[in-house]
Amino acid sequence: MSKTHLTEQKFSDFALHPKVVEALEKKGFHNCTPIQALALPLTLAGRDVAGQAQTGTGKTMAFLTSTFHYLLSHPAIADRKVNQPRALIMAPTRELAVQIHADAEPLAQATGLKLGLAYGGDGYDKQLKVLESGVDILIGTTGRLIDYAKQNHINLGAIQVVVLDEADRMYDLGFIKDIRWLFRRMPPANQRLNMLFSATLSYRVRELAFEQMNNAEYIEVEPEQKTGHRIKEELFYPSNEEKMRLLQTLIEEEWPDRAIIFANTKHRCEEIWGHLAADGHRVGLLTGDVAQKKRLRILDEFTRGDLDILVATDVAARGLHIPAVTHVFNYDLPDDCEDYVHRIGRTGRAGASGHSISLACEEYALNLPAIETYIGHSIPVSKYNPDALMTDLPKPLRLTRPRTGNGPRRTGAPRNRRRSG
């Protein structure tokens, strides 16, 4: 298979419903990515699919295309009631559910199928109002879905298509019991089309597929290496005292168009935000305790380009699909090897190149050997001159103003480059 982002296979080559093809082409989707080219022949034949592919490989459009085609090509279950959706798409996080819904909207507009969205945090009555009018495809997180189901606001007895996205993260976040609860209220596996997608097809994910799917076909799209060949990786060994100044110096050197900085704790993220906001960067903060409306606003501002930098924890950033991220900074090396892959996979997406910079400090350097074993290669090491690090830095801000940061728009050139040769 070609290692380029797109294959020679076109959506129009498949026997897809004409309205689906029209909607795809209107949005500029003509050629399939590898995961789409593997999945569509199976789902169009009514086969269940368990797919492994990294983030940014087009798996969302693979299962949305399959879902819309299936519902348009098969009649609804007889005597279906208004509170019975025909398809259910489960996601591990609110943000991912919202983004899947946004990706599905052009297809819904073109086909007339109705979408519903269900996630926790806020919007309970607003989401419920949409559900009460009847939806064909319901996208949501498991907790809110169970809440609606227990109150009979939704009934899963007419489900014809099920999608489980980022199944490995469902396990990591402890949602597997919720998933099984929802599956038990659906028609049997052989009476519906089932799709599962995951960054890793581990034993536990395969076990779930065996339990809840109908003889699923396993498909995998493996890059040359786990971290993707379009991502330039770089590693520094700072002392704890120099770590923050090194980060700020690297940001001045790289001057990223759009960057995500990962840290292992909420407190550390807030500290980074305070330093960067004080230095005039347009920076947003995304941690688990940020209110849902604010989270969505921050993501929207970052996606639009109103913010240049996003500081986030792993939990807060899981499942996010943000285009054109040029740089990822691992301020802390993650404790989980898979989190390293997920983090740097935020850049180098959709055929673009990206740059990942990791800081192996005294506290987290012990995580490095396991990460390098997992990704199958050593991360190239770069050196820096401690005497050249930035020193003229303002006092960091504290979280007494909106976390989205209101630093002035960056203008002009960055400060002088300070990395040693």
Curated annotation (Swiss-Prot):
Principal localisation: cytoplasm
Domain Helicase C-terminal: 245-390
Region (Disordered): 392-421
Keywords: ATP-binding, Cytoplasm, Helicase, Hydrolase, Nucleotide-binding, RNA-binding
Entry's Gene Ontology BP terms: RNA catabolic process
GO molecular function: ATP binding; ATP hydrolysis activity; RNA binding; RNA helicase activity
Disulfide bond annotation, renumbered to this chain: none
Source species, domain of life: Bacteria
Hydrolase is among the record's keywords: yes
Pfam assignment, any one: Helicase_C
EC number(s) on file: 3.6.4.13
Motif (DEAD box): 165-168
Record carries keyword Calcium: no
GO cellular component terms, semicolon-separated: cytosol
Cellular compartments annotated: Cytoplasm
Chain span(s) of sequence motif Q motif: 9-37
Composition bias, Low complexity: 402-414
Residues holding ATP: 53-60
Catalytic reaction equation(s): ATP + H2O = ADP + phosphate + H(+)
Domain Helicase ATP-binding residues, every copy: 40-219
InterPro entries linked: DEAD/DEAH_box_helicase_dom (IPR011545), DEAD_box_RNA_helicase (IPR050079), Helicase_ATP-bd (IPR014001), Helicase_C-like (IPR001650), P-loop_NTPase (IPR027417), RNA-helicase_DEAD-box_CS (IPR000629), RNA_helicase_ATP-dep_RhlB (IPR023554), RNA_helicase_DEAD_Q_motif (IPR014014)
Function: DEAD-box RNA helicase involved in RNA degradation. Has RNA-dependent ATPase activity and unwinds double-stranded RNA.
Family: Belongs to the DEAD box helicase family. RhlB subfamily.
Assembly description: Component of the RNA degradosome, which is a multiprotein complex involved in RNA processing and mRNA degradation.
Name of this protein: ATP-dependent RNA helicase RhlB
